[in-house]
Amino acid sequence: MALPTAAGVISSGLAAYPAIYYDRVALETLRSNLFLYPACDLKQMPDKSGVAMQIFDYSALQANTVAATEGAPNGNGVTLTQNVRTLTLSNYVDYVSFSNKVVLTAISDTVAEGAAELAYRGALTVDTVISTLLDSVANGDASCRIDVNDGSYMSAAKSRQAQMSLRSVNVKPKANGSFYGVLPSVMAFDLINDSSTGGFIDLFKYTDSQKANLEVPASNRIGIVGGVEWFESNALPTETNWQTTSHTAYHAYVIGKNGLIASSLGKTQLAQKNFAVKVSKFDTPIAVDPANQIAAAASYNFFFGVVQRTGSTNGFRRIRSESSIG
């Protein structure tokens, strides 16, 4: 018996043949790294204490070069000047709700996935509140602004300028001895690609690339350049029509000790209860949903506030620059 020249059963002839396989694991969401919150010095607001915290410091005393007169007390001495600022907490709330059909029939754990996306939204909200404050203060204080000229880019020299500008007004570095810097990826490229004398490449050309962090690791820590420890984040503001109509300005920030003061209610760390995403499952009907069609929800509800340091001397610098690749 001769064999057939073609198969009698092929996929197109089967009505129940699966045309598509649905992967049950979502690809990783393209989220920005968020590094502004760690730049803040945290103050704890106790529960049942209102939503406003007054912080203060003292103005530094000046030298007294007048020699004392023998036997004559020096008048009334000196007075102390306190500088105060009010940190007000705001309430941030959001949620995602899920139908019973989604919970019962979806091929992946949509509730857990939604909670993860909502957690990022909450964290991004905090970083955005911080960058909005930084820009608002910098727009009103020329000493905070370092603007790179059209046709020039982020460099090690600008990192040193930001550090020394802060040191010149007696702003101290963070506890690790470095100022804290956050910049977007396109500015980070220009920084680590700076081949000028004294630039990033020149500084580290005789250093092992891993030890010098020339190869940016998954932690998105660029390294310490000019006394600033730089981290990479793309959740930072931009400006269109920068100096010329075809260019975009990117914002980077360098922050010193007490440059930003932040607070929340009760707990102050992102991993603690104040910033937790709550997942609720509704197993019984309620008045507004008598048919129990909403089966689950993910939500956050937290308080957060941030202010610049007290007094007229700000403890941060903003660098605005276009990028050679952006």
PLM region descriptions:
Residues 1-88, 313:
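N-terminal "assembly arms/tails" that initiate or stabilize quaternary assembly
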Residues 2-39, 151-161, 193-326:
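Sequence/fold signature of self-assembling virion shell proteins
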Residues 62-66, 190-191, 240:
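Short, solvent-exposed loop/turn elements at domain surfaces
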Residues 79-106, 271, 278:
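Short acidic, glycine/tyrosine-flanked loop/strand segments centered on an H-E-D-like triad
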Residues 105-174, 185-192, 324-326:
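Alpha-helical scaffold segments that mediate packing/assembly in large oligomeric complexes
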Residues 172-178, 223-228:
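Short gly/pro-enriched beta-turn/loop segments at secondary-structure junctions
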Residues 181:
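Polar-ligand-bearing catalytic/cofactor-coordination segments
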